[in-house]
Amino acid sequence: MADIQDYNSTPKYETFSYLPAMGPEKMRRQIAYLINQGWNPGIEHVEPERASTYYWYMWKLPMFGEQSVDTVIMELEACHRAHPGHHVRLVGYDNYSQSQGSAFVVFRGR
C-alpha cells in the first residue's frame, strides 16, 4: 500500500496515474489486453501544459485490426522519439460501443 502515490503530488491523467509506474512487462500485458478485447489501438500525444485538455493530437490513424503488441510498442516509441517532450498515451477504441474502451499514458513529457 505504501507504493500508491498521494493524489496531490503529481498530475493525474488516467486511472493508472495513481499507481506506481508500469514496467515494460506490465505495459505489454495492458496492450495485449486492449488487443484481446478487439479494441483498435490509437496513439495520441500532447504538450505537458495542455495535458488536462480534452484534445490531444493523434499520431497517425488508429491501428485498425492490429494484433501485434510489438507493432503497437514500435509506434508508441516512434511517437515518443518524434515528440520527446510530449505526453504519449495509448487509447483502445471500441468499434461496438463507439467509445474509448481504455486509455493510459505510456510516456510522460517534461
UniProtKB/Swiss-Prot annotation:
Keywords for the protein's UniProt record, in alphabetical order: Calvin cycle, Carbon dioxide fixation
Q: Which GO terms describe its biological process?
A: reductive pentose-phosphate cycle
Give the CDD domains listed for this entry: RuBisCO_small (cd03527)
Q: Which residues cross the membrane?
A: none
Cite the GO molecular-function annotations of the record: ribulose-bisphosphate carboxylase activity
What does this chain do? RuBisCO catalyzes two reactions: the carboxylation of D-ribulose 1,5-bisphosphate, the primary event in carbon dioxide fixation, as well as the oxidative fragmentation of the pentose substrate. Both reactions occur simultaneously and in competition at the same active site. Although the small subunit is not catalytic it is essential for maximal activity.
Q: Which PANTHER family match?
A: RIBULOSE BISPHOSPHATE CARBOXYLASE SMALL CHAIN 1, CHLOROPLASTIC (PTHR31262)
- Extra remark beyond the main annotation: The basic functional RuBisCO is composed of a large chain homodimer in a 'head-to-tail' conformation. In form I RuBisCO this homodimer is arranged in a barrel-like tetramer with the small subunits forming a tetrameric 'cap' on each end of the 'barrel'.
Report the protein name in the record: Ribulose bisphosphate carboxylase small subunit 1
Q: Which organism is it from?
A: Acidithiobacillus ferrooxidans
